[in-house]
UniProtKB/Swiss-Prot annotation:
Transmembrane intervals: 18-38, 73-93, 100-120, 126-146, 156-176, 187-207
Keywords: ATP synthesis, CF(0), Hydrogen ion transport, Ion transport, Membrane, Mitochondrion, Mitochondrion inner membrane, Transmembrane, Transmembrane helix, Transport
Species assigned in the record: Locusta migratoria
One cellular component term from this protein's GO annotations in UniProt: mitochondrial inner membrane
Name recorded for this polypeptide: ATP synthase subunit a
Main localisation: mitochondrion
Subunit structure and binding partners: F-type ATPases have 2 components, CF(1) - the catalytic core - and CF(0) - the membrane proton channel. CF(1) has five subunits: alpha(3), beta(3), gamma(1), delta(1), epsilon(1). CF(0) has three main subunits: a, b and c.
Gene3D superfamilies: ATP synthase, F0 complex, subunit A (1.20.120.220)
Summary of the function given for this chain in its UniProt record: Mitochondrial membrane ATP synthase (F(1)F(0) ATP synthase or Complex V) produces ATP from ADP in the presence of a proton gradient across the membrane which is generated by electron transport complexes of the respiratory chain. F-type ATPases consist of two structural domains, F(1) - containing the extramembraneous catalytic core and F(0) - containing the membrane proton channel, linked together by a central stalk and a peripheral stalk. During catalysis, ATP synthesis in the catalytic domain of F(1) is coupled via a rotary mechanism of the central stalk subunits to proton translocation.
Membrane topology summary: Multi-pass membrane protein
Length: 225
């Protein structure tokens, strides 16, 4: 077991000798509204509107050369990250997106698939990305090294960005909550208000980080066409 501060991120806790923490990754599937109702509710209309806006934005970033249905996996990743980030804000629910095990296992295969597709089908186009336009001849070899390194670390930055933001917010909430027993009743009111404001901020961060993860994945995939 980790220290008390990081115990909320401990995936080794179990129930009846079964590690059930990672099952929280799929809790969002239970909350996805049905799309086949005869009369859709307001939530369904809002959900469909959000998906349509994401689809149009991703198609714009991918360009005209993208394949039909290429935005499906990107929207699916956004929805998965969004639900898991929000689920982690509820008490006693394991935050799977705060672990590099999940974020890196999604970012790395996706980045590898983009690279394999680009280098196999558009080799010359991929080589042009290694040397930016207008680079002096003396700096070309150096720019190739820099662009290669920046390309290789992309899956790591995707994974670390999401996990670090989730960990930071939960740690702040934990630290504020641990100070509660030592405070007086009058000061406790300010603590509760502060935690409510921080929870609203964390809700916004949960949505923003899911969007950033999916939009950066879209930008990376648009470079291989």
């Amino acid at each position: 077991m980790m220290t008390n501060l990081f115990s909320t991120f401990d995936p080794s806790t179990n129930l009846f000798n079964l590690s059930l923490n990672w099952t929280s990754t799929f809790l969002g599937l239970l909350l996805i509204p049905s799309m086949f109702w005869l009369m859709p509710s307001r939530i369904n209309i809002l959900w469909n509107k959000m998906n349509l806006n994401l689809h149009n934005e991703f198609k714009t970033l991918l360009g005209k050369n993208s394949f039909q249905g290429s935005t499906l996996i990107l929207i699916s990743i956004f929805i998965m990250m969004l639900f898991n980030n929000f689920m982690g804000l509820f008490p006693y629910i394991f935050t799977s997106t705060s672990h590099m095990t999940l974020t890196f296992s999604i970012a790395l295969p996706m980045w590898m698939s983009f690279m394999l597709f680009g280098w196999i089908n558009n080799t010359n186009h991929m080589f042009t990305h290694l040397v930016p336009q207008g680079t002096p001849n003396a700096l070309m070899s150096f720019m190739v090294l820099i662009e290669t390194i920046s390309n290789v670390i992309r899956p790591g930055t995707l994974a670390v960005r999401l996990a670090a933001n989730m960990i930071a917010g939960h740690l702040l909430l934990t630290l504020l909550g641990n100070t509660g027993p030592s405070l007086t009743t009058s000061i406790m009111l300010f603590l509760i208000i502060g935690q409510m404001l921080l929870l609203i901020l964390e809700s916004a961060v949960a949505m923003i980080q899911a969007y950033v993860f999916s939009i950066l994945s879209t930008l990376y995939s648009s470079e291989v066409y």
